[in-house]
A protein has these predicted regions:
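Bacterial N-terminal signal peptides
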Residues: 6-20
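Flexible, solvent-exposed loop/hinge segments and secondary-structure transition points
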Residues: 20-160
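Positively charged n-region of N-terminal signal peptides that target proteins for export
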Residues: 1-5
């Protein structure tokens, strides 16, 4: 009886290991990392003289962190949300200057909740998008995007 139980237990252990090997592995955007990205992005824009809102979302487009600089227009929060959603929807930086993904025929502005404005940048671990950082409030989306890209470059070692 003991021999059968030992064999059965070994079989379960092997089955569990095989099942685990088949499960997809994924990275999750932690709150700590989201806060660091938001803070670095806001610090860069502030140093450049811009009052902005920074929004960091996870892979499901759910807000993790939002920071609004003092004196920032309330509308920047909604625009940042739309930039983040656009980034996650198309898995690329937001903005009209970006080419559409292969097979995509509709420009991003035709999808409700998206916007044709730069400032949304994917947060990637390798080729996997784990979230997005979106910025609104600088005088031009290129400046919004530059702040986000600066923060992601600064924190690149944490995105491995």
């Amino acid at each position: 009886m003991t021999k059968h139980l030992t064999t059965l237990a070994a079989g379960f252990a092997l089955s569990a290991a095989a099942l685990q090997a088949q499960l997809p592995q994924s990275r999750v955007l932690t709150l700590d990392l989201a806060q660091q990205i938001a803070q670095e992005t806001l610090a860069k824009c502030t140093a450049d003289g811009f009052k902005v809102t920074v929004l960091v979302v996870d892979s499901m487009s759910a807000a993790k962190v939002m920071l609004r600089a003092d004196g920032t227009s309330p509308s920047t929060a909604k625009v940042a949300e739309m930039k983040a959603y656009s980034t996650m929807m198309y898995n690329r930086p937001s903005g009209p200057a970006q080419p559409l993904p292969p097979g995509q025929t509709a420009p991003p502005a035709t999808i409700p909740g998206t916007i044709n404005a730069q400032g949304g940048v994917p947060i990637k671990v390798g080729d996997v998008t784990i979230g997005a950082v979106a910025v609104s409030g600088a005088p031009g989306g290129d400046k919004d995007a530059a702040c986000a890209n600066f923060a992601l470059a600064k924190l690149a070692d944490k995105l491995k």
